[in-house]
Amino acid sequence: ELSGTVETAFIGGWHRNAKYVELRADGIRRVMTERGLDAQDPDVCLYFSAHGTPISYLEEGSQYQEHVEESCRLIADAVAVDRYELGYQNHTNRTKVEWTEPSNQDLMPTLEADDVVVVPVSFVHEQSETLDELDLELRELVEQLGMGFHRVATPHDHPDMGAVLADLVIDALNASAGAPLAHVGASS
């Protein structure tokens, strides 16, 4: 049984953190170097895959799509890539829900590239939506289309990820110095 309260603070917009953007860019550069790919080659497509979200959430004020698009732009800029694509991993089994577009399944066949470097932009750790939906399902589609599939890992085990998260917390604490944080009480 828990009792008491916990002070909390919301840390938003951390996709803009320069160190976070750089470690995401580092992952892309690493894959491109290992695979002998050139980010400036027009036959190489930098492809961001984001978790889809219902349009109704966006209509209710969620900034998710804006943040994903901004994150892609910042990371692409850090890699010095002008051309990139963004597709969404939508839950196609939920047909009564309108999802963010374009879906990976719709966008991928339209690409004109020999190689696709896939970045799971809205994921910070590996899970079924990266390991299954990207590594198995999307890879199969990409290879059926005759393109090379190159997946960038999520940053969960990047040596700088812990420091990025610590900096975000420290910055939030410093910003709230003297200001009350929100209180979350445990129910008894």
Residue ranges with predicted function:
Residues 1-188:
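Extended amphipathic ligand-handling, pore-lining, and cofactor/metal-binding catalytic surfaces
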